[in-house]
Each structure stands twice: as C-alpha cells, then as structure tokens.
Amino acid sequence: MTKAEFTILNHLYERGTERTNELPEVALTQILSDSLSYERLVGKGYIDRHSGKITAAGIQALEPYRVDNAIIMAAGASTRFVPLSLEKPKGLYEVKGKRLIDRQIEQLQEAGIKDITVVLGYKKEMFFYLKEKYQVKFIFNAAYNIKNNIESLYLARNEMKNTYICSCDNYFMDNPFHQYEYQSFYAGVTVRDRTNEMYVETDEQMRIVEMKKGKAEGLILMGHAFWQKPFASKFLELAEADRSIGMYDSLFWEWLVKDHLPELPPFYLKEYAANVIFEFDYFDELRKFDEQYIHHTQSKIISNIQSVFHCEEAKICHFRKVEEGMTNTSFIFQIDGVDYIYRHPGDGTENIINRSHEKRSLEIAKEWGFDPTYVYMDINEGWKISIYIPSFREPDYQNFDDTEKILAVLRRLHAIPVSVDYGMRPWEDALTMEELLVKKDPSCFHTFYPLKEKIGKLYQMTKADGVKKCFCHGDTYRPNWMIKADEDVILIDWEYSGYSDPGIDIGYYIVDAMYEFDQAEQFIRAYLKEDYNEQRCFHYMAYTAIIAYYWFVWAMYRESCGAIMGESLYQWYEMAKKYADHLL
C-alpha cells in the first residue's frame, strides 16, 4: 500500500469512528485529492464506491499498520521551567484547564491506544494517581537527574513495538494520534526564525536526511514520534552500545538518531501547521499561551516573591535557571527591570543548616558591607532572595593579586566586633552527619574510620593552641566570591557562617584551590602577616584537613539525600587525607 493510499484509507477509517478532533498533517488535503490513489482503493474493494466509506476489507488492510502502544516520558526535572518545576513536574501543570499529561493520555485513549507506559523519575509519587485513573503502567528511572531521556527509553525497551514516543509536557491543539501509522516519523513544524530546537532536512518523500542545530529557519522537530519495531530495535541496539561509553548520557534521544541516520531504518517527518503543537520550555512561554499564569499561577514560590516585593504576579517575569549549586537550586527573575536571584533550599538541608542563624549572618554581612546583595530570607522554609550580579569574575587561585583581595576581606571579616551564639564546628558537625549516614546505611562509613581517627587527633591538637574564635563565613570556596569590574569584592552564601575558628575560612580556600603544602604555607603567612609563627601555621594547616573532612562527610550525606556531588567528594577526601598524613 502506498503512503497516499494509506492516508486516504486511514482518514476514512477515522471518519467512520466519528472522530471530530483530529489534528491533520500539512499534506493531508493534497493527499485526499489524489483521485488515482482513491480509485485504486475502490478497485481493491477497500472503499465502497456508492457510500464512499471504508469497507471491512479496507479495515483489514490497515491492520499491519496498527499502533501497539505508547510510551510517555515523564522522568525529567525540566530545570528550564523554573520556578514551577521546583514545586512539581511540568507534565502535571494545568494548561487551559487540563493537566498536560492527563490531556495527552486521554488523546491517546480516544485514538484507540490503550496500552500506555509512563516513565517516571523526578517527584514520581505525584504521578501515581494516573494508574487508577487511566490504568497506565509505570517504569521508574532512578538516573533521571544524571542522564537524559535516552535512559528512559532504554528502560522501556521491553515495551517497544510499534510505539508512540511521547513527552508528558507537549500540548496538542487537537488529537494527533491514530490507531494506525504508516511509517516511523517525528512530528515537526516550519519556523521562520532561529530557535534552540533540532532542524531537519528532508527528501521529496519527507524522509529525514540531515539533522542540525542553529539554523535561521526551516523544519524543526516538535511533538510526538512513532517508531515501527525495526526502528525501535536498531535505536535500542545503538543505545545499548553507548551504555559503557556514556557519550549520549546528557543528550536528548534525537542526538543519537542524528548521529546514526544512515544506520537506522528510514525516519520521516510528519509536518503539522504552525501553532498547533506546543512545548513550554520556559515559564514565560506558558504565560503567553495560558493567561491564567499571568495573574494566578497558584505557585508558592511566586507567592513568596510577591510577599517580599508587594507587586502583582504579572510583574514577576523573565525567569532563567542558574546552574544548580551544591546545596540549593536557584533561578533568576526580574521585577521592574531589576534582576534578582531566588534560592530554593535543597532536599535534606534542613537537617544540617539552621536557617534562623543564616538569616542573622546575612543581616550582619549586609550591615558590614560584605554582601550587599541580600534582600530577604524566610527562616521557616529556607528560601532567599538576593540582587543578581550579572558581571563579575571569580578569584584565580594562582593569581597573587586576587589572593591579596581575598585575604583582605577575610582579615576584615575576622576582625569585626560581632559575636553570635552559633557557628560551624566542623569536627562535631561531621560526627552528627556521620550519625545520619549510618542510620541510613550502617556499613557506609567503615572504610573511613582510619581517616576519622587522624582528623580527630588533629582537632584535639588545635583546641588549646590560643587561636581565638571570630565571626567566619564557613564556605569560602571560589564560587562564593565575586570580584566586580571595579575590583570590589563580594562574599555571598552565608549558610555555614557564625562564630567559629578562622581556620575554617583559610583552610577551605586552600582545600578548594588544592594547594600544595608550600602554597598553603605561603597563603597562611600572607593572612597572618606579623602574627605568623610555626604554631599558628600548624593550626591553619590542621584546619585545612579538618574542614576538608567536614565537606567530605557533608558530600556523602548530600548524596544519601539524592544530590550528585561528582568529583568534589573525592577531592575533599583526598585533601583531608593528604594534609592529615603530612601533619601527623
């Protein structure tokens, strides 16, 4: 059966089922006017000449093209969709009165697709209602926060047949799904401007022959896809081969197709009209489409911002994500032309950070000129708003001029006449976090007891050596320093601050710089100036090991809460071990 014959026959079948909300592809009108194909179908007995309806034989002829099932990908955190994605997955937001994923499932079921599998990850429990409501199946992607959607498709490999591949956050103006599909395809539309989507080139039969990013205009991929079994099998073979390499771990599945087009079975573009398929990558895009989100987002985060600035929701705009920090997640927003940054506290941080203490420290830091960016912080929930500084640089650990700038700030900070009744105690705090870890996994810490013993010994050696406590920052690694164009230095993020040992601030800068012993001694000498002596130097070198150990245990705890710490965890372990062994 030719593509034209299939399209005509399938259209008549859809009319026979009394579907009225079909989303037509661009080529449909032209194909339906193909009288030669129509006559061939009549001649084969697939269309009744008198009634113009599909016959039983025609329906039987469609059977080899039946769609078996659908897979809906709903595992990702949609980090570009801040701030709403911090509260719940994008697929669960209502658009025009219906949740995105509910609408898509209902459209699939209306088209006769009853076998639907949803791949879950981020906030998966919020989707559980779908099982009872729609009788869908679930697959769980535990790697949703470290791998992209190829992992979701690979985990669903046993469901792959003649299958729709869907994203939970697509919005179709009408129903694009059918009980029968002719060939493997990806939906797409023509755009007249540059976007961040994948552009495609096609041949005369609309087979995709090239895929590329960054064109000025053309056909882009957008919406659902359909894979026939041979295409799915080859895709999964390629995905399997990449699992030991990880080249595509951070990429969308389209990239694997792009790089292997010649090896894959034919893959076609099904073009739709403009403005019938929508993807809301950013919250501002959703606001343009559904006006309820201009004034009534029903978002706790937006409400928080409103309460601070006493403004209408519509004035809060231009949301942009910030690369996730080690402790929290943040995003930028704008009010009346001024950019601010909102910090959303990370999971598990309530067990290791006292937010009322942090707020007091932020007030002190602003009062004394160390952090003029602070606007507001909520001590109950831990969210914070600051002025966004768009242009600055971080210090260069190997640049002596930068070192002098940093040390000048630290000397001034450690000299302010401020005393508070809280502060970081890296040894004791590490023991507390170890207890939290061991509650989750009693055996997780066994191999680190020798290092723990050395750090404990160093701590005891520094307790009575005369170094006085003072007001400290507690988290002096490079990303918390801003050197502005006028060389003014700002120190941000005061979560770990308080009345503590100054070795914490000096030691952590050394740890993050991964200084060798001679570089660390030079840094300590420059900090202490005329107060330098061997005993003082030992104290700060010891605290380099102690604070590295603290952050190592902290990283283990954060990973136990689901965070991804990467190589930092190992670097902290190595620096703690290296300095402890050197000093003992």
Each PLM stretch: what is its role?
Residues T7, M173-Y248:
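Conserved core of the sugar-phosphate nucleotidyltransferase
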